[in-house]
Regions:
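Peripheral peptide segments
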Residues: 1-160
């Protein structure tokens, strides 16, 4: 399974790893947290400046977004992203989740027949509400699991 998260306008003010750079954004931090629960084989950030960005790559803050780019620039950006995906061994036929807006997905769609666009048709408020619900379900499941397995008697009863 592949997961691609888009970069965000809100960023750290200092050089850091890519997944840390965008954490000041509630949208990114919630998307990243939820995406990690899906246990992907590959997970990258789609960066307007850096194209395909491994989570641990160190980068400096920048101020550029694809929303300001022309259609031709977005198409060239996507071609470079696909080239980088190939060099990173991304399986284009694998189930793929995009946590990204239209500008980041429009020219990548054709490469991923088994894609799911997590933000499609939703406004920012809907996306945030949806992520809150998803993260709430994950938290509740984890809490229930911990209750069951943290009690020795419960574990023994479960095994028998």
């Amino acid at each position: 399974m592949n997961i691609f998260l888009s970069c965000t306008k809100e960023k750290e003010s200092k050089r850091c790893r890519a997944h840390e750079m965008y954490m000041p954004s509630s949208l990114f931090s919630k998307s990243y947290t939820y995406a990690k629960t899906l246990n992907p084989d590959k997970m990258y950030i789609l960066s307007a400046k850096h194209h395909l960005l491994p989570l641990s790559r160190e980068i400096a803050p920048y101020n550029y977004t694809l929303k300001d780019a022309s259609a031709e620039e977005r198409k060239e950006w996507a071609e470079e992203v696909v080239k980088q995906m190939k060099s990173h061994g991304v399986d284009f036929n694998a189930k793929t989740y995009f946590f990204a807006g239209e500008a980041y997905i429009e020219y990548l769609r054709e490469y991923f027949p088994n894609r799911k666009e997590m933000y499609a048709g939703k406004g920012i408020g809907e996306i945030m509400h949806w992520l809150d619900k998803k993260l709430g379900s994950v938290k509740e499941s984890l809490s229930n699991w911990l209750k069951i397995y943290s009690n020795k008697d419960s574990v023994e009863n479960y095994i028998e």
